[in-house]
């Protein structure tokens, strides 16, 4: 349960104000189809984070515990710096196609998550916890905890959130995770 909660919290902190949250907002305001958008986010996230977890678990099996600890610690510190860099929403409207809101969302979210900090965090968490199901479910839950309210409340919530403070809180959380990992803090397993 602890691994699940760490995975969920890590992704929630990284996803607040992220480009995929902005993408959810854009898709919702353009398509006005919340249920297919939410289902599309779920499918894309499951696929993307499963891929990331598989890669992370594979990489974790190749590294010694000491090298893995340092790699993960530095990765979390780099994520802390990365989260401070503002994401920019695309200025144009999403292309409309015959795929419908669901397929457009699946495709857009899967591609937007490629190389994103939450995907990299999912890889790092899988390398650490080595439980694919827990990592995939925890990271997906974290994404959905951020994206579902964004879709359901759309513009109202986004206008009132102080994005700078959210970014600072996420950077602080990633920094703490990085330092604790480097120091061998027990809940992270090192």
At which residue positions do the language-model features occur?
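Short loop/beta submotifs within extracellular cysteine-rich repeat domains
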Residues: 17-21, 84-86, 115-120, 130, ...
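Juxtamembrane transmembrane-helix termini in multi-pass membrane transport proteins
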Residues: 1-61, 121-142, 149
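Juxtamembrane boundary at the C-terminal end of a transmembrane helix
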Residues: 179-190
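Membrane helix-loop-helix hairpins that form the core translocation module of multi-pass transporters
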Residues: 32-101, 149-172, 176-179
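Selected transmembrane alpha-helices and immediately adjacent juxtamembrane segments
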Residues: 94-119
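Juxtamembrane/interfacial segments around transmembrane helices
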Residues: 93-100, 121-128, 157, 189-190
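Hydrophobic/aromatic residues within the transmembrane alpha-helices of Major Facilitator Superfamily
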Residues: 12, 16, 46-47, 81, ...
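Short hydrophobic "helix-edge" motifs at membrane interfaces and signal-peptide entry regions
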Residues: 7-9, 103-107, 152
